[in-house]
Amino acid sequence: MKDSRIYEIGPMFCGENGHITMRSLTSLMVDISTIQAERVEKNLKVMDHKVWLLYSWDIEISKPIKEGCEIKITTIPTHMKRFFAYRNFIVEGNGEILAKAKGTFILFDQDKQRAAIIDKKVLVAYGESPEFYTGRNYKKIGNFEKSELVSIRRSDFDKNHHVNNGIYFDYIKEIPGLDEEKISYIKMIYKNQIKNEEKVGLFYKKGQDKIDFKIGSEIEHAYGMVEYV
């Protein structure tokens, strides 16, 4: 199963130099996956009061995506296991692959306020497809060299009353010297939602063409790494 949609990359999707932001790119990926999910789950009663929450992103950028581009984003649900559902995404433009990604989602029961085991009816409805992009394993580092303090804005919150997952990509842009246009790979793993915090810490360690990062307060909110071209 796969679904695709064409998107025009207008200035609202781009940063100061006309390149698409990671927040915008992931938002468009979520958009096409939501369109697919609404169609597939329309008559599945077992999905009542359940939602998909993002658990992690693996994204590889092979070509720049700029303002004025017309891109096609395709999403393919590959497989599911217990609480988790895995999706591949492919971003194409001018006959070329511009980016590919793996998104991991966790099924959440809104009534019980906990993760829910995926019902067999959902497995059958989505089916399985081979993974064309498996992402990478990542081991969180223990020691970070530097940190910044990030203020949480009311506009960062979405209808679920927590900071939108895409905003985390904006937060890591506060790392000095991080140039979003030159990112070739990014891993983002979400842990605990940002709900009541007024500020969070942004911890990071720079290496050669690589930055490890963590977003946290009294609890851990997210971590991952960025690689440059």
What are these regions (language model features)?
Residues K182-Y185:
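Phosphate-/nucleic-acid-contacting segments
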